[in-house]
Amino acid sequence: MALLQIAEPGQSPQPHQRRLAVGIDLGTTNSLVAALRSGRSEPLPDAQGNVILPSAVRYLANGVEVGLGAREAAPSDPLNSILSVKRLMGRGLADVKQLGEQLPYRFVGGESHMPFIDTVQGPKSPVEVSADILKVLRQRAEDTLGGELVGAVITVPAYFDDAQRQATKDAAKLAGLNVLRLLNEPTAAAVAYGLDQHAEGVVAIFDLGGGTFDISILRLTAGVFEVLATGGDTALGGDDFDHAIAGWIIEQAGLSADLDPATQRLLLQTACAAKEALTDSEAVSVQHGAWQGELTRGAFEAMIEPMIARSLKACRRAVRDSGIELEEVGAVVMVGGSTRVPRVREAVGSLFGRTPLTSIDPDQVVAIGAAIQADTLAGNRREGGELLLLDVIPLSLGLETMGGLMEKVIPRNTTIPVARAQEFTTYKDGQSAMMIHVLQGERELISDCRSLARFELRGIPAMVAGAAKIRVTFQVDADGLLSVAARELGSGVESSIQVKPSYGLTDGEIARMLKDSFEHAGADKHARQLREHQVDAERLLEAVQGALDADGERLLSDDEREAIAFQMQELRDLLTGTDGAAIEQQTKRLSQVTDAFAARRLDSTVKAALAGRNLNEIEE
């Protein structure tokens, strides 16, 4: 008789057999894959012992080269050697063109305005390029671990929007990887340090990589990692340091700013080498072609000081959003290769009043944390129990209401996964459909927010305005992807959409949106109040006009009609202005002057309904 095999839900039925899962840091400059081995999370090396894989892909006529060889070939073959592709993930062709000379590629348009890079193998999308990097990491992991992977946790910047996250998942799928979860990079770093040092309290994760900057404020308590607030800049990183040095070389050497792609690549490689050398040296000799000069650490720090200031400003904002004081931050974790720059560490330490933590390699810490989470999600139970991660959404999500107003359904910094619902109603009598316009942002008017998607709810039963009840539910999953559903409660008609925008935010747009929301808070509040008063007034004017057309001649005297018409015109005149208080007062006056008319209409309706019926019929 066979025994029934029993296992904990989500756990392996054979505890001694580990399910192979990895953490992947898909970075702008470099990528890594890590896994738990002998109880310790560590990056996995390639056959030559290198753990870091340059995020570079070169397309050849008869093959694909990924990693160091592709990066080294970039100066001689810039059009087919794709670097920093992470900056293109989830972006539109128009967004990519704004990056200009920073991207020496030939771009062609594709479906849904997605940018394709023209290579010797034909057009390649950023998703395909990223997939080629992930394929190498997957193969490395399976070769090292000796088996097939059940899945991977892939890290993304906390500020990646829906389009960028979806593009990352699409790349993983194309690479043959099962995505267990997308994990914010700062949260992954917290996982690594929290387990290694059993830290509790408030921690700041300062993540300055090759192409993006993220700051996260987390509270660590008894194995729970809660992200209190996030901030950052999608267009700030070590690449920008390189471009600053490259600009200095162009100026010092008297070069033309209009360089061919090969020269651009060579110049950026020279700049990157100088930046890395200045980590340990006070000065470095720089040579480009026939020109040679000396770059001091002080001069380099002066170049990047505005960029560092931008990062510190984002840190202060994140601390404010988290509702704590700078002094409450008990530890600062440095993540990303660009945090090796001495001036960066010095500035961050000065801001938070403590020496930043760098005991885990800043290039490896994200992958190490992702591997720990992957091992848990794969069903391998670890000592110390489960780990709970509470990420947050970076920008508020909501929908458009009458008057072009943004109604926030899920506020920014809400812990995910999350589901929130609100009820709305119809604006006009007999309205049978409703357009649901999903938005992202912090401002009060939809013109100042980002449109994510639109869909229609049809089949709403004919009712008077305000009678229908439409419940709109927003749901954000653990990967930060949004789905929206609308349901009319009386009839049960329903419509939904999964938000997968065809392109992401432009460089710095998220940071700009947050900045604008703070700077324009007062004006936005006034604008919202004005639009609300205007909508109320327009609704009343429409209702009164409809009543006059139907029953005005029958139920009102000439003087009464004139009085109502006068108040209506007064209100229409005010609607062309910006005095919200005056509009509100005139709306009240029009409502008061039509009260008697409304009562007569009600009486008339009741009499008509009762005409020809006796008491017994009514009681029945």
UniProtKB/Swiss-Prot annotation:
Example GO biological process: iron-sulfur cluster assembly
Amino-acid biosynthesis recorded as keyword: no
Organism domain of life: Bacteria
The keyword Transcription appears for this protein: no
InterPro entries: ATPase_NBD, Heat_shock_70_CS, HscA_NBD, HSP70_C_sf, HSP70_peptide-bd_sf, Hsp_70_fam, ISC_FeS_clus_asmbl_HscA
Keywords: ATP-binding, Chaperone, Nucleotide-binding, Stress response
Gene Ontology molecular function terms on file: ATP binding; ATP hydrolysis activity; ATP-dependent protein folding chaperone; unfolded protein binding
Function text: Chaperone involved in the maturation of iron-sulfur cluster-containing proteins. Has a low intrinsic ATPase activity which is markedly stimulated by HscB.
Family: Belongs to the heat shock protein 70 family.
PANTHER family reported for this sequence: HEAT SHOCK PROTEIN 70KDA
Protein's name in the database: Chaperone protein HscA homolog
Species whose genome carries this gene: Pseudomonas entomophila (strain L48)
Gene that this sequence comes from: hscA
